Amino acid sequence: QVAGKKLVVIEKDDQGKPDLGKSLLASAYSDDKADIAVGPTSSGVAMALLPVAEEYKKILLVEPAAADAITGDKWNKYIFRTGRNSSQDAISNAVAVDKAGTTIVTLAQDYAFGRDGVKAFKEAIKNAKLVHEEYLPQNTTDFTAGIQRVVDKLKDQPGRKVVMVIWAGGTPPYAALAAQELSKRFGIDVATGGNILSAMA
């Protein structure tokens, strides 16, 4: 209970679909009389929910969607975030790989989380050289062509070579990358997000 009122939790599954998420949130606010909503997981869904919260003048607590735009240029006063955002991820990732003589290719999903993550990562690196951004659909399960484009951009580069993966949900590319033995065959390292605490110190 809060202030003598019983809390009721209603779960709704947006299935990672922005249009479905939008209609479910509108229904929660109007039909279920929800005062606050929490979620979603997908940044793409979160972007679709922002104007709904503003229209109904009700709070949307975004967690764990991480695209910067959620509390950046698309933000409104009904939106709150409890977790990290893409820029925080990017800064910590840059700390790990941003060294002179390093060449980087990014591999990301083609939606708000992936694009915001790459944008923030590009802004955070100062010493390494980013030579290509590879974006794949969220529902990708065959990574062969995308990985080949990554290899083609990196294999002949001098110095350390890194593919920075910015991926959330769906089928992640890590098993496909490991199967290609990039380090053994081409000297290409695979890097991805990690703990941000040391980078924030």
Segments the model singles out, each with a brief description of its role:
Residues Q1, P40-T41, T102-L107:
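Short beta-strand segments enriched in small/hydrophobic residues
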Residues S23, D68-A69, K77-R185:
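Extracellular/periplasmic Venus flytrap/periplasmic-binding protein
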Residues K17, V45, D68, S87, ...:
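Surface-exposed, flexible loop/turn segments at secondary-structure boundaries
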Residues A179-A201:
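Extracellular/periplasmic periplasmic-binding protein-like sensory domains
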Residues A34-A37, V162-M164, I188-A191:
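Short active-site oxyanion
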Residues V2-G72, T82, L136-T141, G170-L177, ...:
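Beta-alpha junction/loop-to-helix N-cap segments that form part of ligand/metal-binding clefts
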